[in-house]
């Protein structure tokens, strides 16, 4: 499949400045768990960044909606494979989240089709992960279950987590211009938890 056709089908990739390479984002309003948490003070989703700044530009909103609509396209897996296959690192959902078990399984297929790419998928959709045995996750994909509360406890039933804290952090981005630079902890399965500072 040609790149132009892949972009037409999927809505194209996003390019968050913090990340080392591309990402794929969806509208934050479509987050199933996050949409509820956004109304609750003390959660990382409260006053969500994906409802501010450039995310409010009409062209960005349109692109997010195109990507959301593309998820059920019969060639979505093939198209995403075309766009991702030459990247060394890829982040799923710098905004938005998993929409269904089928969506998650399709992400698995993209990961299997791009074995040279390391994939990172942060999520708050624990209800979908409960259908998944961690042992069937592609070796080049790490799914980090993110805690629901700032300074809260991490899930113990899932092997990789991320959290937001007002007290500590392991993510160095804040100290280096809000960029990953050479850090790849989020993609590293040996790193069981990554803690981000509260925005």
Regions found by a protein language model. Give the residues of each.
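Class I S-adenosyl-L-methionine
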Residues: 1-199
């Amino acid at each position: 499949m040609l790149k132009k056709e892949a972009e037409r089908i999927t809505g194209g990739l996003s390019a968050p400045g913090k990340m080392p390479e591309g990402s794929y984002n969806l509208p934050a309003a479509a987050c199933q768990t996050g949409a509820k948490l956004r109304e609750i003070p003390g959660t990382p989703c409260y006053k969500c960044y994906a409802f501010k700044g450039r995310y409010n530009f009409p062209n960005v909103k349109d692109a997010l909606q195109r990507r959301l609509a593309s998820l059920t396209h019969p060639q979505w897996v093939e198209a995403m494979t075309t766009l991702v296959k030459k990247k060394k690192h890829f982040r799923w959902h710098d905004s938005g989240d998993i929409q269904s078990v089928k969506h998650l399984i399709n992400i698995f297929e993209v990961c299997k089709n791009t074995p040279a790419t390391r994939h990172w998928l942060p999520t708050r959709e624990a209800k979908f992960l409960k259908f998944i045995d961690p042992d069937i996750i592609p070796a080049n994909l790490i799914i980090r279950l993110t805690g629901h509360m700032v300074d809260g406890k991490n899930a113990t039933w899932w092997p990789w987590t991320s959290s937001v804290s007002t007290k500590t952090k392991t993510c160095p981005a804040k100290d280096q211009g809000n960029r990953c630079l050479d850090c790849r902890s989020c993609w590293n399965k040996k790193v069981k938890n990554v803690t981000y500072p509260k925005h």
